[in-house]
């Protein structure tokens, strides 16, 4: 008797099968149909969500190579003009006459992570020479107010001072003014906290030079109208926008197929030594570490090095007012709980961020998660197939080897991993629950740490049934992926850490040039303030 539940391949139910979540997160979005606008009309909205990954994906989205039709009609991504990626209508800018508070409000109002700052004190559109303000500047400002950053560790020599007052005296005056609630010009903090030079490319330049710059660790580049010295800026291209563009257009670029289907271990990208903070440490320690190391994110781990969460430089916006000031001196886990609850209130639903992958995750899966979560990095944890006794270096593969050699020998068909299985969802829920426990006023950070450690030890594994993502063994960033794309094109060695080292060298050279015998600048303790921007 035939099985009543079996279906032939021609069965309508079988033919109309919707793709699984794993398939949606592992394959690039389909190309637009001929009935729609051409392939140049992809949206580059900053408000990416999971729905944007799934839009239009009701057809068969199985893994494998790009179809023959797409390959024959494909284009070389390095030939794309930068004008295709610019959004002049979205270019928001401010001038150096803005206060730090006004600059911060601009970021929040327009949902930006960075904004160009004209050197003019009145004309925000004059961007011939400009700096940029982002949340790392806000973090520096906050740490100065709380005595966790010293002026002799910053670029005081870059400050513009009128009159006979020394630059250090002027800087001290500005900090004291801010401590008493006074407004400080944004130009002051920008010059104290210099970044990499603003690299500019004309609209008619091809994508490769920008890919190379962003793959070397530059976070964003400016797009100008033409190549003339005084050409106006028409747009800003960030790492996050570029990776979204490459993902949405991946089916146009058959040369990416091999990379997208390979695992991150086979491609040998990322770092096996990510910067971390323990969940029971004070939040202000995490902010200070990001300032010192010139990074924008830290992995939050427990004392067994199991991943518990993530803290980003953007999170500093939640502690800029006096009503949340106490969070600075509570545990990082406590802050994560607060942050998730606030996002849940704003979005109207629970928030369980997907911030980790394994070394067996395909690059396509990693990129899809980065785009869906609008993240700059994902933490790499031990694969569930790896025993607890496996070493961290073994768990992450031969990451210190030569990338180009790994690419040539990698398998062309990476596995489809079920990282969003029900077990994975419970992992994120458990991590959020651990953070929620930290927010209980009756529970100290030490108790939280003990509770989390107990959860881990009960299972006997770092990534098995503990309810946590697993033991941290690495990190993969937008810089790593964009550098991989650039390197795979011409074989030219790309250094993902170049820009970061330049930022740190700039800071170190400034410190060594300042006379540090002038004594301590800030008080050791700071008992009461009005917050960075008052009681908002």
UniProtKB/Swiss-Prot annotation:
Keyword Isomerase attributed: no
Gene Ontology annotations of biological process type: cellular response to glucose starvation; regulation of mitotic metaphase/anaphase transition
Residues of the CBS domain: 192-255, 267-327
SMART domains: CBS
Transmembrane is among the record's keywords: no
Record-linked PROSITE patterns: CBS
InterPro entries: AMPK_gamma/SDS23_families, CBS_dom, CBS_dom_sf, Ssd23
Subcellular localization: Cytoplasm; Nucleus
UniProt xrefs under Pfam families: CBS
Biased composition (Low complexity): 439-460
Assigned keywords, A-Z: CBS domain, Cytoplasm, Nucleus, Repeat
GO molecular function: protein serine/threonine phosphatase inhibitor activity
Principal location class: cytoplasm
Entry GO CC: cytoplasm; nucleus
Extent of Polar residues compositional bias: 1-17, 42-55
Region of interest (Disordered), ranges: 1-72, 439-466, 496-536
PANTHER family noted in UniProt: AMP-ACTIVATED PROTEIN KINASE, GAMMA REGULATORY SUBUNIT, CBS DOMAIN-CONTAINING PROTEIN
UniProt family annotation: Belongs to the SDS23 family.
Cited function: Involved in DNA replication and cell separation.
Identification of the protein by name: Protein SDS23
The organism of origin for this protein: Meyerozyma guilliermondii (strain ATCC 6260 / CBS 566 / DSM 6381 / JCM 1539 / NBRC 10279 / NRRL Y-324) (Yeast)
Lineage: Eukaryota, Fungi, Dikarya, Ascomycota, Saccharomycotina
Gene designation: SDS23
